[in-house]
Amino acid sequence: MDIKEIALGQIRDSIATKQKCIDSILGDITKAGEMVSKVLQSGNTVYLCGNGGSSCDASHIAAELVVRYKSGNERKALPALSLSGDSAVLTACSNDYGYEEIFARQIEAFGRKGDLLIGLSTSGNSKNVLLALEKAKTRGVKTISLLGGDGGRIKNLSDLDIIVPSKVTARIQESHILIGHILCSIVEYNLFKME
């Protein structure tokens, strides 16, 4: 095997995972797009959280909503925030309450009825994401989970689960950012009639 074959194998595996997404979760993705659109249209806020690569995806999606998704689409900023961005809050909460509480504590502080929390976890077992989703429920915050594998312990905790049909972390993360881009595209179409 040479490096070209390695690259080709990764690309083919990624394409196969995206095809499985079309076959099994397309309806859930469009439902999520409608949910995000309604929350933003009503003036509420979208929060996102995750760990590691999922944290990066959460920040990426939040940035696309605040700034814009498609180049050339001039529109107003939309209220979206990644809960991974404030190092002072993350370290203070980790020190005082434990790492598991870093997202739930922020939802307790900022989450309002009608807002939305999108939790990302490739395994579906991230304790801090799970606790944030549970806290969101107590605050009247709607919830969407982007998961992988069998959905883990987070499965069925949210108003809507989108479970990427793969057990490979890289394929799940690639699919999560694609789903995030689709959500942003649906939002720009629904709110601003931008394609």
Curated annotation (Swiss-Prot):
Top enzyme class: isomerase
A single cellular component GO annotation: cytoplasm
Known catalytic reactions: 2 D-sedoheptulose 7-phosphate = D-glycero-alpha-D-manno-heptose 7-phosphate + D-glycero-beta-D-manno-heptose 7-phosphate
Cofactor binding: number and manner: Binds 1 zinc ion per subunit.
Domain SIS: from-to ranges: 36-195
Annotated binding of substrate, by residue: 51-53, 64, 95-96, 121-123, 126, 173
Protein localization: Cytoplasm
MF-aspect GO terms: carbohydrate derivative binding; D-sedoheptulose 7-phosphate isomerase activity; zinc ion binding
SUPFAM superfamilies: SIS domain (SSF53697)
Pathway membership: Carbohydrate biosynthesis; D-glycero-D-manno-heptose 7-phosphate biosynthesis; D-glycero-alpha-D-manno-heptose 7-phosphate and D-glycero-beta-D-manno-heptose 7-phosphate from sedoheptulose 7-phosphate: step 1/1
Known cofactor(s): Zn(2+)
Binding site for Zn(2+): 60, 64, 173, 181
GO process terms (BP): carbohydrate metabolic process; D-glycero-D-manno-heptose 7-phosphate biosynthetic process
Family statement drawn from the similarity comment of this UniProt entry: Belongs to the SIS family. GmhA subfamily.
Protein name as catalogued: Phosphoheptose isomerase
Organism: Leptospira borgpetersenii serovar Hardjo-bovis (strain JB197)
